[in-house]
Amino acid sequence: MGATLTPLKGLSMRIYYGLNESSDETKKDKQNLATFIGYKGKGFSIGAEYNLYKNDGNVKGNNLTGFSIYGSAQVGKSTELYARYDDLSSKDGWNEAKEESAILAGLQFKLGKYVKIAPNFRMSMPKADGADNRYMGYVSCYFGF
């Protein structure tokens, strides 16, 4: 269940709660709480979200938290610059091998009414001791019909 508020033009806030009940009485129910706030102005947008995920794998105390910050800006008639930062952590480090921060940045070019291409760069920064950062380049394509 969730609720969205738009108190001002361009400003949006959302809260969501989800419950996934375990079919096994010896295991815990999974719970997810997500919040979002964002603003869209003329030629730009910014947003942030926070997520709390309780009892991952139906195990009591296997809790994860994550947050993201992102934005975009028009830099030309058909070009948009965008960036995003994500962070995932676990309570007491139980999931350290999968914990990481990540950065994504790129440009999106609108080539026609139904065609967009977006080259982007991604950097993944694992939190585990001795883990190396990963660097990736992508090109995303959109074809609408």
Protein language model regions, located:
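Short beta-strand-to-turn element immediately C-terminal to the catalytic PLP-Schiff-base lysine
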Residues: T4
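Outer-membrane beta-barrel pore domains
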Residues: P7-F145
